């Protein structure tokens, strides 16, 4: 059971990416906006990591690490990219669809993702919280820009 939780937590951002694409497929303006800005969100995270330069917690567990991914901006932990991505996806889909059951499922995946990143000491609680807040704020900005621009 613990391995399933870890895998959902690790791959949560990919799962939410595909869920969002499926649910947004009939709303092309929002779909393209999401598709473009999820990648902008990733680069925003890298830029913030290079500006803030806060190290990851000491003693993080490399058990779920694939290769040496911690180079460049990924050496730093603030803000958490996983947290920022899952909360961006969740907030964006909520703003477009406003489905409570879907929101609860996505928040569950967000929770598992945050837990997994904290459990293996990839990030501190503050790094995870800041990542989540940035993801939510950026999703709101993107949603309102797209809504205004494409007159939805």
Model region roles, listed by residue range:
Residues 82-86, 123-147:
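Alpha-helical transmembrane segments that form the membrane-embedded catalytic/substrate-binding core
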Residues 50-59, 123-129, 148-152:
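A cytosolic-side transmembrane-helix exit/cap motif
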């Amino acid at each position: 059971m613990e391995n399933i939780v870890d895998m959902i937590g690790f791959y949560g951002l990919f799962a939410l990416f595909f869920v969002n694409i499926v649910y947004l497929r009939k709303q092309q303006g929002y779909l393209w906006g999401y598709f473009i800005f999820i990648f902008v969100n990733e680069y925003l995270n890298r830029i913030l990591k290079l500006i803030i330069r806060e190290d990851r917690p000491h003693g993080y567990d490399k058990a779920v690490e694939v290769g040496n991914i911690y180079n460049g901006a990924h050496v730093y932990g603030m803000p958490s990219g996983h947290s920022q991505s899952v909360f961006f996806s969740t907030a964006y889909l909520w703003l477009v669809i406003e489905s409570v059951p879907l929101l609860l499922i996505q928040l569950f995946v967000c929770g598992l993702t945050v837990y997994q990143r904290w459990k293996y000491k990839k990030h501190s609680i503050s790094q995870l919280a800041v990542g989540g807040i940035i993801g939510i704020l950026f999703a709101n900005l993107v949603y309102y820009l797209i809504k205004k621009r494409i007159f939805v």
